[in-house]
From Swiss-Prot:
Subunit structure as annotated in this protein's UniProt entry: Part of the 50S ribosomal subunit.
Protein name in the entry: Large ribosomal subunit protein uL1c
Similarity comment: Belongs to the universal ribosomal protein uL1 family.
Gene designation per UniProt: RPL1
Predominant localisation class: plastid
GO molecular function: rRNA binding; structural constituent of ribosome
Amino acid sequence: IPLFLHLLLMSRKLLMKRRTKVVRRMNLMLLLTLLLSPLSLRQGKLHWRLKSDRVRSKRFLEIQKLRELKKEYDLKTAISLVKETAKTKFVETVEAHFRLNIDPKYNDQQLRATVSLPKGTGKPIKVAVLTQGERFDEAKNAGADLVGGEDLIEQIKGGFMEFDKLIASPDMMPKVASLGKILGPRGLMPNPKAGTVTANIPQAIAEF
């Protein structure tokens, strides 16, 4: 705000001396800055708009009455409260944020894991498996949608991506490494920490 007032006073002084195109442009820029910045006018003074200034919906205010401010709820109570306040006609999305007090910049503090949901995501997942030898039949019998070796690797290089999860046996990883640039950006690259590089392929398929 001090910078804004300084520019405004400077433009007024210039305007009094000489009304030029430069001054008009400066005034226009100041006006746009004022309109686009999160400022509000209260009793003739400029104030930054805060989140509390926003008009809250009636539903939001009713939900706020059901919880105590600054109170920490245990997980079970918090989930019950979320379900109790879900009044819309569609299935609402619930986000959970965890503060782990770790710094992912350090290798020993990086976190990557897979959690198996008790009832899944509600959407069918197409699982592909890269393996060879005896594990080939194991993967098929375990219910994998696609099973292949070098042939499937070549298909993926050609643009084939008709799967949601890709599992690979450890002996295939030297060949799978060539798919890093294709699978990596899509989050499909097999990884031991994610449970998608394993010798126990039937178990991995069952988890997905």
